[in-house]
Structures are given as C-alpha cells and as structure tokens.
C-alpha cells in the first residue's frame, strides 16, 4: 500500500478517527486475520461465522497494526465507519453481517484500494483483470508468472477474488509494482462491475461462460452478462484498453 496517514484514510473512507492522531503513519497493507498482522498495517474488523473481528482489534494493534477500520469504537486506534444495514446481496462476504458492519468496512477498504490503484496507475501500474466460470485461478497464476519476468507483479493468493480478497490484494501493490493481476468472481449481476470499479483494468480476459453458480444467476445468458461487465469496464481501444476473449465460446 502507498504510505499514508490515519487522517488521510479517514478522509478517503468517510470514517471518523477514534483514539488515533491524524498524523499516525500507515505503511503496511490491510489484514483481516489478527494472527497475520504486520507492523504498520491496517486491521479490518469484519464479522464472520464464528467470530467478529471487532473483538480482536485491540490485540491486532498490540501486535503492531497501525490502526483498525471498524464499524464501532474498539478501544484502540481506529477509523470508524457507520454500519450500512442488512445487505440484500447473495455474496458470501455478507452472510454473517446482519447490521451491515462488515459491508461498511468493505466499502471503506474498497475506497482505500481505489485511491491506491489510481495513484499507482499514474506511475505506470497496469491492471489486468480475468474472469470466467472456470479456470480463473490457474490463468491468473500463469499470467502472474509471465508478468513477473517484466516487473514486480501482485496477484491474489489462492482464490482471493471477492469483495474481501480483491481490495486485500489491491492494497498489496506498492510504488514498485508494475502489474496487478486481478481475479474477478461473481455470484450475481453487478459483482464484477463492483470489483472493476475498485481497480479499473486496462486489459481484461473473459475465459468462458459455464454453469457455475447458475442457481444464483438463473441462466448462462445472465452469467455471460455478468462476465461481460469486465469488458465494459475497460477503456476504449484508442485509450489503451485491450479485451481478450475466448472465440471458441459463443457466449463470450
């Protein structure tokens, strides 16, 4: 993540500082697992199936996190954002979020990630997006391996491709990063578009349109519409946008 301060994070996210000086430096990435915090990072207080990150926030700061992004005061340096209320999305990210606390934290980190990628793009960062019903992760891994021969490359670990994993990955980009390979998943129309707004791609690849999550989508045609949101997010060809499409799949 680009070096910043607590005050700047509050301004970017629309949150309020609690127990934290505006000039507090933040130089690390974001982390949602309190066991994985590193010095200077931002801990994300997210509710989960078995635990609530808010309960681990003070411990995360004690272990080195610079501050917490939370939906309520946590007794530690924090940027506090207002809960957004229950979400209607079928995303797994909101499965254990009855009051929208997690949604508010994710919206905040999405804004922070967008600021990060916008500033880095001015310095030459290229964002490559990949989506499809199957093969996203292996294709992402191959792309990243190839691009690393040309410069520092950031890509999701495993299948970090949703509302949590995507901004988490984006905020691992630094001023030395030349390429970001973003894997974009969806369980409904609008999901890919949302992820693309966080890190606008210049190159986009749609691999295929299959039947994964067809119960949520309703038909392959709707899945095709959702995957096509990646291409809609690209700049015009005259401005450097590049679409890579699977000509063997008629729905692509």
Explain the meaning of each model-derived region.
Residues 2-129, 139, 143-145, 149:
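Short, basic phosphate-binding NTP loop
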Residues 98-247, 251:
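Phosphate-binding loop of NTP-binding sites
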């Amino acid at each position: 993540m680009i070096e910043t301060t607590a005050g700047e994070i509050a301004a970017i996210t629309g949150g309020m500082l609690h127990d934290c000086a505006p000039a507090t430096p933040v130089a690390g990435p974001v982390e949602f697992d309190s066991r994985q915090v590193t010095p200077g990072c931002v801990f994300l207080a997210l509710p989960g199936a078995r635990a609530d990150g808010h309960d681990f926030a003070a411990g995360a700061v004690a272990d080195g996190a610079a501050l917490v992004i939370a939906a309520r005061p946590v007794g530690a340096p924090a940027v506090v954002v207002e809960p957004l209320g229950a979400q209607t999305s079928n995303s797994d990210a909101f499965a254990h979020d009855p009051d929208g606390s997690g949604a508010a934290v994710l919206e905040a980190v999405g804004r922070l990630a967008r600021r990060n990628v916008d500033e880095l793009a001015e310095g030459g960062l290229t964002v490559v997006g990949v989506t499809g019903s199957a093969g996203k992760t292996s294709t992402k891994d191959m792309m990243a391996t190839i691009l690393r021969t040309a410069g520092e490359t950031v890509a999701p670990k495993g299948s970090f491709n949703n509302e949590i994993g995507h901004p988490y990955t984006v905020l691992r980009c630094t001023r030395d990063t030349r390429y970001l390979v973003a894997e974009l998943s969806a369980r409904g129309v609008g999901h890919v578009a949302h992820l693309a707004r966080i890190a606008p791609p210049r190159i986009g690849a749609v691999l295929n349109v299959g039947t994964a999550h067809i119960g949520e989508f309703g038909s392959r045609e709707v899945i095709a519409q959702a995957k096509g949101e990646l291409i809609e997010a690209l700049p015009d060809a005259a401005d450097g946008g590049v679409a890579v499409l699977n000509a063997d799949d008629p729905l692509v």
